[in-house]
Regions:
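N-terminal export signals
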Residues: 2-26
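C-terminal segment of N-terminal export signals and the immediately downstream linker at the start
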Residues: 20-54, 157
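A short glycine-rich, His/Asp/Glu-containing loop-to-beta-strand
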Residues: 48-85
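Histidine-centered catalytic micro-motifs
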Residues: 83-90, 128
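Short acidic-glycine-tyrosine-enriched beta hairpin
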Residues: 108-123
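Ligand-binding loop in jelly-roll beta-barrel domains
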Residues: 123-149
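Acidic/histidine-enriched, glycine/proline-rich intrinsically disordered or flexible terminal extensions
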Residues: 154-186
Length: 186
């Protein structure tokens, strides 16, 4: 991936936030909020099943922004596990590594990320990631918010570990498409 495109895309988000109120992208514009470290704004700790057993905290919900964006903090507890190769039809994602190390695939390119690194995953481009370190933590930004928050809540609510076929259906129900297996660490 070209660094210039990453920087340009990242910087293009900022004007959207400036004009979000004018274009009614923000749901609750008259009141700010603070989310304490180690907590989620909604849903408490979302404990995932299926893809990995990580914990997600919603920091900014799509409901807070009128669907404009969502921000999550992911505590990674699944060394050697990650997502299947998948794509989002309508959302771009940005990951920022707070702790630990991860491998990402974006299209055909593969990257190792460690603390302080970030990566941009454009919509409609297959991508996957796998946790290399024993534990880790990432901030995940999705723009627009789409249904990723619903995906996390759905997976956490299951009373069993989902089969690969169930996961494919859950991905599809939440505007994503599984296109390949999880990323193996080289």
């Amino acid at each position: 991936m070209k660094r210039g495109r990453f920087i340009l895309t990242t910087l293009s988000i900022f004007p959207l936030t400036i004009f979000a109120n004018k274009f009614n992208l923000i749901g609750n514009t008259d009141k700010g909020f603070k989310i304490d470290s180690g907590t989620g704004r909604l849903h408490g700790h979302i404990k995932l099943k299926g893809v990995n057993s990580n914990i997600l905290d919603v920091k900014v919900s799509g409901n807070d922004t009128g669907g404009g964006l969502a921000i999550f903090e992911q505590t990674s507890l699944s060394q050697g596990k990650g997502t299947p190769l998948h794509l989002h039809h309508s959302q771009d994602e940005i990951f920022y590594v707070l702790e630990g190390s991860y491998y990402f695939q974006v299209g055909e390119e593969k990257y190792k990320l460690t603390k302080g690194d970030s990566i941009f995953l454009p919509r409609k481009v297959p991508h996957a990631w796998t946790q290399e370190s024993e534990t880790g933590k990432m901030t995940v930004i999705v723009q627009p918010a789409g249904k990723l928050e619903d995906f996390f809540v759905t997976v956490a609510a299951l009373n069993h570990e989902p089969t690969p076929a169930e996961m494919q259906t859950i991905f599809a129900d939440n505007e994503m498409q599984v296109v390949g297996p999880p990323l193996k660490i080289d």
